[in-house]
Amino acid sequence: MSDFVPGIELSRAFYGEVVAPLLTGVAHGAALIGPGSEVLEFDTARSADHDWGPRVLLFVPGERVAEVEAKVVAGLPERFAGFPTVFGYHGALRPGVTVTELGGWLRGRLGFDPREGVTLLDWLSVPWQRLAEVTRGEVFCDGLGEPGLEAARAALRWYPQDVWRYVLACQWRRVWQEEPFPGRCGEVGDELGSAVVGARLAREVMRLALLLRRRYPPYAKWLGSALARMPGSAELAESLSSAVAARSWRERE
C-alpha cells in the first residue's frame, strides 16, 4: 500500500500548521497554484524526485515582501511531515514558501492582472496550461481584501461564450486540416508519416474533448490523464488508443 500523500494535501497542512502561525497580524493570501503536477492533482510518488515538497505561495503587499519573506524563512522547520522545507527547484535550492505580490505574480504568469479585466487579446494569448495553473490548485487564505486571489481566479474560470466558440472552431479546424493525411501518407508508402500525423490528430481530438467540457487542456505529459478523468471519456480514449497503436494506415483510418 502506498503511503504517498498528494502535494495539495501536504501543502494545505503545511500552511495551516507551520506557515499561518508565522503570519499573525499580516494580511495575506496563500495558495498552491502555478506550475507543478500537484496543482492539477496529477502528482504521484514519482513526482517527489524533483521540484516537489511542502509548498505555499504567499501574497502580501509589495512593500512587505522582503520583511515577510525573512520572517517566514527564519521560522520554517527543517522538515515537515518527513519532507525538507527547502528543496531543489530546477537545480537550485529554495524554501518551499514563495513570498510575492499578487499583481506582479499574475502579470508574470499571464501577462496581465485579471482583476483589472480580461481583454479578447488576453484570452487568446494565454496558453491553456497557464490558465489551468491559475484556476486549479487551492486557495488556503484570501485575506488581502477585494478584489483578491479568488476574484482573479473567478475571472479566468472559463472563456466568455463567444471566445469559447471561437476556440472550439479553431480546434475543429486543426483536426479538419490534417484529417486526410494519415491516409495520404499511407497511399505513398509512408507508414511512419501516417503514424506521426495520426498521433497529432489524436492529441488535437483529446484537447477538443476537454474544451467541449469546459476544461483547459494541460500540456502533453498530463493530457491523457486529464482525458481519463473526464466522465464519459472511456469510449473516445479507447478509439484514440487503437488509432495510435495501429500498425497500418488503413487500420489507423
Predicted regions and their residues:
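Conserved nucleotidyltransferase catalytic core and NTase-mimicking acidic/glycine-rich helix/loop elements
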Residues: 131-253
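Helical scaffold of the NTase/Pol beta-like nucleotidyltransferase catalytic core
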Residues: 1-32
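Active-site nucleotide-donor binding segment shared across nucleotidyl transfer reactions
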Residues: 20-57, 61-63
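Conserved NTP/Mg2+-binding pocket subregion across the NTase superfamily
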Residues: 66-187
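Glycine- and acidic
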Residues: 1-8, 55, 183, 188-190
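A broad, structural surface signal
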Residues: 13, 17, 21, 70, ...
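Flexible, glycine- and charge-enriched loops at secondary-structure boundaries
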Residues: 8, 12, 65, 168
